[in-house]
Amino acid sequence: MALRTIRVEGDPVLGKVCREVTEVTPKIVTLIDDMLETMYEANGVGLAAPQVGILKRIVVIDVGEGPIVMINPEIIESDGEQTGDEGCLSVPGKAGQVTRPNYVKARFMGEDMNEYEIEGEELLARCICHELDHLDGHLYVEKVEGALHDVTYEDTQE
């Protein structure tokens, strides 16, 4: 496993639509392992492949209940609404108010290329929506209500 460089706002790769994964090769397995290591090292709860410069439809998420690896994910159901502060490893030191669904159901492939579904509420729902936006070339700052504000590492540890 290796740490990968996280691309930041302004990098053209973050504005591109990612390609579907058709098979899990050793390179894809290494990418997933590297993404998890990079996410944990950066104290993030989610990371999408384009954030490390790879235009593949892969996200990793861990909101405190263990890692979730999603290949070719899509949201198939959503409900409710939540508004809260959101940040991004690709927009360091900033956060802003974003409204997202309070509940989502997503379908995805696992590393075994079998199909799975996951249901999430609150933080997990927010994270799934946020990471899937990356796969279509969108950053959360496009959805911010009001202005971005500065955050420090200490703010994120509360």
From Swiss-Prot:
This is Peptide deformylase. Its cofactor is Fe(2+). Fe cation binds at C88, H130, H134. Signal peptide: none annotated. Binds 1 Fe(2+) ion. It catalyses: N-terminal N-formyl-L-methionyl-[peptide] + H2O = N-terminal L-methionyl-[peptide] + formate. Removes the formyl group from the N-terminal Met of newly synthesized proteins. Requires at least a dipeptide for an efficient rate of reaction. N-terminal L-methionine is a prerequisite for activity but the enzyme has broad specificity at other positions. The keyword Iron applies. Pfam families: Pep_deformylase. It comes from Agathobacter rectalis (strain ATCC 33656 / DSM 3377 / JCM 17463 / KCTC 5835 / VPI 0990) (Eubacterium rectale). Belongs to the polypeptide deformylase family. The active site is at E131. One of its GO terms (biological process) is co-translational protein modification. One of its GO terms (molecular function) is peptide deformylase activity. Its EC number is 3.5.1.88. HAMAP family: Pep_deformylase (MF_00163). Keywords: Hydrolase, Iron, Metal-binding, Protein biosynthesis.
